[in-house]
């Protein structure tokens, strides 16, 4: 832990005696000098070592216990816990406020995967904590809480649900000795590993599926780059037209409804017979537009829709859902944190390929938290 990010320093005053004692004892646990399951010094020994009052030492020991570093075992004394937080408490950071209009289907799927992993780990097992509204940095209560958790070494590693551009020059990116991993669409220049959602596999598999249905005229609705799709469209013997390609401003997702309606109002010989929706946050709007137009699915239009899976997603709609299993994403992130904690340099990029719903509905393998 670097002193420049110590919480007491952040608020402009030196740490008091209690927190000095806590910080030193915590360092000894984190360094392994006091290993998991090892006896913890008695309160009398701590009083003698630091020359502190019984009240100060009692308060310090009680707080270390509440943090999860130590536990009493009756007459046997006090011991370092077998699962101290610096080894078993992972933090997942969401850029935006939970439940806000910026909260996405991906965030929901990842949150559900986290809840399931915590349920399976049990009350005394490793845990994944979530922190939201990170983009507001010091204005966010979660940011301030997590900053203190990090500098006081109460976190095993940080998992950024998206690239953490807003967190530059903050302890969450600057503090030494903290394993980190980010989830992103592409490899990044961050000095820590990335779990990448493989867009190449999404493009290839969606068009291969539609070609297999005999479809040849493909439209796109959603955030996409035409230059990335054009080679794959051509490779599958398909065609598209400029007015079938509709990049959407995700700040106004409802615009997808009118676009979908218009696509199916074109003359029959100028109408697509296949549609790829490239963001799951648009799907409801697209389907509303198609319903208003009276489009018959899949007879008139076959759809591949992007999806973030969490093991709970189901759909009776006549479309194919293709995307990324949030449980698999989470498991990869946890594994990369653990790899770093073991002192091993992991691969810079761990790609997560796109899968169809029927390929991951048996449940995916759950994250190995330890």
Segments the model singles out, each with a brief description of its role:
Residues 21, 88, 193-221, 255-264, ...:
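Hydrophobic alpha-helical segments within soluble ligand-binding/sensing domains
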Residues 91-93, 154-162, 219-222, 269-282, ...:
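Periplasmic-binding protein-like
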Residues 118-138, 219-220, 230-260:
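Short beta-strand elements in bilobed, periplasmic/extracellular small-molecule ligand-binding domains
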């Amino acid at each position: 832990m670097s002193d420049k990010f110590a919480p007491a320093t952040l608020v402009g005053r030196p740490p008091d005696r209690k927190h000095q004692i806590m910080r030193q004892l915590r360092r000894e646990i984190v360094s392994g000098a006091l290993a998991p399951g090892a006896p913890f010094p008695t309160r009398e020994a701590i009083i003698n070592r630091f020359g502190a009052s019984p009240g100060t030492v009692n308060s310090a020991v009680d707080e270390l216990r509440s943090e999860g570093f130590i536990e009493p075992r009756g007459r046997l004394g006090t011991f370092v816990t077998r699962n101290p937080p610096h080894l078993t408490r992972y933090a997942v950071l969401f850029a935006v406020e939970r439940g806000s209009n910026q909260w996405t289907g991906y965030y929901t799927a990842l949150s559900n995967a986290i809840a399931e992993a915590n349920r399976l780990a049990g009350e005394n097992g490793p845990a994944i904590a979530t922190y939201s509204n990170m983009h507001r940095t010091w204005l966010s209560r979660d940011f301030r809480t997590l900053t203190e958790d990090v500098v006081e070494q109460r976190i095993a590693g940080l998992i950024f649900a998206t690239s953490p551009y807003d967190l530059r020059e903050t302890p969450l990116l600057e503090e030494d000795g903290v394993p980190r991993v980010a989830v992103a669409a592409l490899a990044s220049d961050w000095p820590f590993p990335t779990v990448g959602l493989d867009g190449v596999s999404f493009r290839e598999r969606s068009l291969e599926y539609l070609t297999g249905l005999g479809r040849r005229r493909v439209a796109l609705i959603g955030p996409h780059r035409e230059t990335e799709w054009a080679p794959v469209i051509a490779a599958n013997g398909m065609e598209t037209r400029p007015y079938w390609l509709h990049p959407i401003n995700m700040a106004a997702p409802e615009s997808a409804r009118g676009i979908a309606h218009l696509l199916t109002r074109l003359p029959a010989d100028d109408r697509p017979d296949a549609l790829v929706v490239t963001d799951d946050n648009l799907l409801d709007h697209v389907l509303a537009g198609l319903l208003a137009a009276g489009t018959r699915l899949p007879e008139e239009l076959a759809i591949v829709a992007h999806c973030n899976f969490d093991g709970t997603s189901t759909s009776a709609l006549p479309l194919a859902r293709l995307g990324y299993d949030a449980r698999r994403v989470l498991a990869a992130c946890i594994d990369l944190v653990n790899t770093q904690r073991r002192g091993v340099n992991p691969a810079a990029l761990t790609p997560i390929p796109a899968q169809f719903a029927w390929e991951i509905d048996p449940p995916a393998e759950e994250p190995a938290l330890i």
